[in-house]
Amino acid sequence: MTIQLEVCIDNLESLHYAQQGGASRIELCSSLALGGLTPSAGFMQLAAKHASIPVYAMIRPRQGDFLFSSDDVEIMLADIHAAKKAQLQGVVIGVLTQEGHIDRDILNSLMKEANGLGVTFHRAIDQCIDPMAALDNIMAAGCERILTSGLQANALDGVDMIAEMVTYCGDNLSIMAGAGVTATNAKQIITRTGIREIHLSGKSTRPSHMVQFANQAHMGSADIDDFSIPVTSVEKISAVINAIR
């Protein structure tokens, strides 16, 4: 059984590293530190140019919850259009109601705009109060997969729920495990759940290439080092590939 390995990235440098490591698919984001937000149109275009594997763009206009306003939805529709224009292979979406259910109306609107693209429903499902009803709605909308940690903080802790989802959906929806997946636990997660897809960042950092700079002014939170650049690790991705063979 071939296992698909999706790598989430938020810069073009990481795209090259993910491909070198053996990734099967890219989830294209900005701001992975915030859980992943929508990448820019320029990033989408350059990713499409340089990728030799499928690229799915995250469609998430802001950090925080998955209860989106009409303005948010308008942005999401425009961003899906941008992903199409960039000739990406798919998008990653997720929308909830105030009560913690799938927002079927918004999901159907997004799916209509995404016609012709592959669609992953992201970890918004991990904040649903009734995950099996959520799966029914996601399948009915026409999504091809979900990304989930089994409603837990990480996929290893959520293996029982993930396995239940796999059984429930059968061949109607692919279940992809993500959150905390590493070379150490990937094989165990696959064996215990029956999944055929895993998701990870394989992140590391590299130092800035700047040789002179003033370092007293922070561009964001003071606890974030502006001169340490997050990038995908070729070695970490390769290690996961080797672990699941």
Curated annotation (Swiss-Prot):
It comes from the Bacteria. Its main location: cytoplasm. It holds the Pfam family CutC. It is found in: Cytoplasm. Keywords: Cytoplasm. One of its GO terms (cellular component) is cytoplasm. The keyword Thylakoid does not apply. GO terms for molecular function: copper ion binding. InterPro entries: CutC-like (IPR005627), CutC-like_dom_sf (IPR036822). Belongs to the CutC family. HAMAP family: CutC. This is PF03932 family protein CutC.
